[in-house]
Amino acid sequence: MKTLTCSLRRLGAALAAAVLAVCLSLPAMASAPLVRDDYGLFDGDTLSELEAGAEEAADGHDCDVYFLTVDSIGDEDQRAYAKNYYRDNDLGSGSDRSGILFMIALGSRKYVTITYGGGVTAFTNYRIEQIEDEVVPMLSDGDYADAAQTYIDLCADTLDFYAENGEPLDYDNDP
């Protein structure tokens, strides 16, 4: 009986340790950030606000909204760089990794918007041009936080339109 009691105590301690280990690892399993400031433009509060906006924009749409700042991409084509970044960092929502990513390389002054998975359907070339037409002048003026927020807001509007109308926002149905 004494041996059984000791064995049960050891088993209980082992289970408690396992549960604790799983609980401690949960933050590491949290979703990856949607606003990725590799350049270091934004202070902590701004980054938190932008992240909350991007999460809200993507919520319920199975399409993540990413805003990425980097220093320089050298001579690499910005579209190739952004697509490689997207794939290499396992970005996107769901099995088809749906999303949209706006990247600006501040050192080289290059930018691009790419879509992936369901983001390709939700964001037409027409709509991407509209978004860039709003965002890029703000970037040129150095209004980086406003540019990021505008991008996130326009992506949210686009995803909402797609969800409500069953078709993407395009030149023939733009309100």
Map each language-model feature to its residues.
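A structural boundary signal for the start of the first folded domain, especially the loop/turn
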Residues: 2-175
